[in-house]
């Protein structure tokens, strides 16, 4: 324990908390360019081919972002909007691509939870 004199000289410091979405630099979303679009396998006990893109953000940081929904039209040099939100079974993937904005199309024939996947209301 510090003495009162040490506290007068130095004071106490607050512990700094780590931000989960540091690459967004405090923004809710950030624009970026796809540098690589690929599939990867999840950790045990799951099995699939998850669609992931490597994105260079306007903040200058390159991150891995998950492409949600069935089917996508992304390729290298596509402009995407990236939001926070990790994918639990993909280590190192802490961002998601927003469907239906910029070059990313919405999910076709989506009936429920449409706003999350950028799908328009069917007439």
Curated annotation (Swiss-Prot):
Entry-linked InterPro entries: NA-bd_OB-fold, Ribosomal_uS12, Ribosomal_uS12_bac
Region of interest (Disordered), ranges: 1-26, 103-123
One GO biological process term: translation
Positions bearing 3-methylthioaspartic acid: 89
Basic residues compositional bias, start-end: 113-123
Keywords, in A-Z order: Methylation, Ribonucleoprotein, Ribosomal protein, RNA-binding, rRNA-binding, tRNA-binding
Keyword tRNA-binding: yes
Molecular function terms, GO-annotated: rRNA binding; structural constituent of ribosome; tRNA binding
Entry superkingdom: Bacteria
Database matches in Gene3D superfamilies: Nucleic acid-binding proteins
HAMAP family: Ribosomal_uS12_B (MF_00403_B)
Family: Belongs to the universal ribosomal protein uS12 family.
Summary of the function given for this chain in its UniProt record: With S4 and S5 plays an important role in translational accuracy.
Protein name per UniProt: Small ribosomal subunit protein uS12
Native organism: Corynebacterium jeikeium (strain K411)
Gene name of the record: rpsL
């Amino acid at each position: 324990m510090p003495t009162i004199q040490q506290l007068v000289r130095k004071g106490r410091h607050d512990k700094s908390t780590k931000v989960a979405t540091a690459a967004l630099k405090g923004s809710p979303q950030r624009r970026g360019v796809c540098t690589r679009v690929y599939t990867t396998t999840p950790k045990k006990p799951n099995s699939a081919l998850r669609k992931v893109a490597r994105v260079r953000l306007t903040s200058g940081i390159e991150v891995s972002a998950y492409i949600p929904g069935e089917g996508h039209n992304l390729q290298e040099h596509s402009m995407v909007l990236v939001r926070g939100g990790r994918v639990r079974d993909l280590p190192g993937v802490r961002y998601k691509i927003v469907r239906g904005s910029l070059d990313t199309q919405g999910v076709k024939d989506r009936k429920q939870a449409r706003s999350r996947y950028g799908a328009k209301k069917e007439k």
